[in-house]
Amino acid sequence: MSISEIVLIGIALSMDAFAVCIASSMVYTNMTGLRKLSMPILFGLFQGIMPILGFFLGSLFASFIEKWSGLISLLILGIIGINMIREGLAKDEETEPKKLTLWILLVQAVATSIDAFAVGVSFAANSANIWQSAPIIAVTTFVLSLIALFVGTKAGEKLGDKAEILGGIILIIIGIKSLF
C-alpha cells in the first residue's frame, strides 16, 4: 500500500474526528493552551492506536465490530449531542462556560476511532504494513483536527449561545451517519 493511499485512508478516517473537533471547540470556548491541543493529540493518538488493535485483535472482535460499531458510535455521540442541545436550550445568562473534561475527550476519541479498528482488521487481511500505516493515520488526524479546532473556535465566537445547540446537532448527525 502506497503512502498516498494511506494518507487518503487517514483523511477518510479523520472526518468524524474533524467534525467532532469543530463541534467541541464551538461549545467549549474557555479552552486554553494544552487543553486545546489535547483534543487533536488524543484524536490522532486514538486514530493511530485503533488500527493497530484491529490489526492484532481483529480476528477476535471483527464480527462484533462490523455488527455493532455504528450503533455504539450513535449511542455515544447521540447522548453527548442530546445533552449539549438540552444544555444549550436551558442556558441562562449566568451560566459558566462549559469545561471540556478529560472524560469527554476520551469518550469522543473512542467514538470517532471505532471505524479505525475495522480498518486495522482489513490491513491484517491484506498484509499491510501497520507500523507504517498507523503513524500516518495518526498524524493526518492530528493535523485535520488541529485545523478543525481553529475553525470551530472561530465559528463558536460568531455563533455565541447557539454554538452548543449546533454542536449537539453535528454530533447526532455524525452518530446517525455511522449507522450507514
What is the predicted role of each segment?
Residues I52-F56, A111-A124, I172-F180:
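Hydrophobic alpha-helical transmembrane segments in multi-pass integral membrane proteins
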Residues S2-F18, K67-L77, N129-V143:
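Structural signature of hydrophobic alpha-helical transmembrane segments
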Residues L13-S24, E87, T112-V119:
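Short helical (or helix-break) motifs at transmembrane helix termini and adjacent helical loops
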Residues S4-G58, A124:
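Juxtamembrane transmembrane-helix termini in multi-pass membrane transport proteins
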Residues L34-A62, S127-E157:
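A small-residue-rich subset of transmembrane alpha-helices
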Residues N83-A111:
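Alpha-helical multi-pass membrane helix bundles of inner-membrane/thylakoid proteins
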Residues S63-L89, L159-F180:
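Selective transmembrane alpha-helices of multi-pass membrane proteins
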Residues C21-L34, I82-E94, S145-K162:
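C-terminal ends of transmembrane helices
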